[in-house]
Amino acid sequence: MQYELKTQVIEPQRQTFTHIAKRYGDKPASRYTEGSIDVQPKEHFQYRPTWDPTREIFDDSYSVFRLTDPYSYLDPRQYYYAPYVTARSGHHEAFATSLEYIEARGLLERLPDGWRSVLTELVLPLRHLESAGQLILCGMARFGWGGTVTQAAAYSAFDRVGNAQVLSRVGIALGGGTADLLAEAKEHWLQDAPLQGLRRMAEETIVETDWGLALLRLDAVDRLVYDLLYQHLDDQAVVSGAPAYSLVAQHMASWFADNRRWIDALYTAWREDPELGATNAALLAEHGAAAVDTALEVVTPFAARIDELLGGSSAVDRITMTAAEVRTAHTGAAA
């Protein structure tokens, strides 16, 4: 008996979903595209929200920033659930490896007094700022318009919980395996003068009803704080006998660089919208500059305390320079 093997090509009955084919053509689509495009609820709402009957439960007017086609914006990272979880798993495993090395070598115990104070008084309390960031981005995920926008915001909200956990793990390690320093960090967040501007800004932004303005304010503070703590101080730690700080900072800096990609792409989409671009650009210039000014005001006492603890003046200079750069990016003109 003989057998003859043949290759048979089975053509798929469809390349992608109909709504994707109408937008991009009848061709294979990525999982990101199929899971993200045209999923925004737009009709068949049963009632308007009792707390704002002038709008639908899902409405494009929850922010002054709008896109003619919300799906003109795409997350450049192409994150949907599987690649997002894979990326973040790798990120936190890398941090865990660094923390194991830090603990094994006793590097936290060897921190100079000034650097230890920076960590305990100023860095660890920012786990509460990360928690505020999570709430702010959850608001954006709920009230934003367009699945690609709200999806990116939701993943960023998850990230803020992860960032808070990173800081918490550092605090527990620095506290000898106890949560004592985390309890102290909460009191610093609630009571210490250098942190009260940040706390006020966080609480006010949590209740901001315009998700676009809330994003601008959170982003302005992030750009000053993350650059100061995880770039500028990272460089100083390398030459100041604080390698433990540098080993932690690298992971926060890498997350921030990744997070910037979806936010910068959204700003670009707002500016380049064929119909609403000019309006969005004017709003970005106005509200972006205001957000940066507020951020500089609330971060300055924080930076001044860093200078006091480390014996210098470079922290305040750094945030002032960064604020000018961010303001220019929003307005297109030098401060």
Role assignments for model-derived ranges:
Residues 34-39, 118-122, 145-161, 241-258, ...:
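Alpha-helical scaffold segments that form or flank carboxylate-/histidine-based iron centers
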Residues 101-122, 180-218, 277, 281, ...:
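Acidic/His metal-coordination segments adjacent to aromatic residues that form catalytic metal sites
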Residues 129-136, 163, 225-229, 259-262, ...:
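Amphipathic, well-ordered alpha-helical segments in soluble domains
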Residues 138-152, 172-179, 205-212, 231-251, ...:
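Inter-helical turn/loop segments and adjacent helix faces that build the functional surface
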Residues 47, 113-144, 207-236:
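Alpha-helical bundle segments that constitute or directly flank the non-heme di-iron/ferroxidase center
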Residues 155-173, 251-266, 290, 294:
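Alpha-helical scaffold segments in carbohydrate-active enzymes
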Residues 113-192:
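Long, hydrophobic, well-ordered secondary-structure blocks that form the structural core
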Residues 1-129, 273-335:
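Terminal targeting/low-complexity segments that flank the catalytic cores of oxidoreductases
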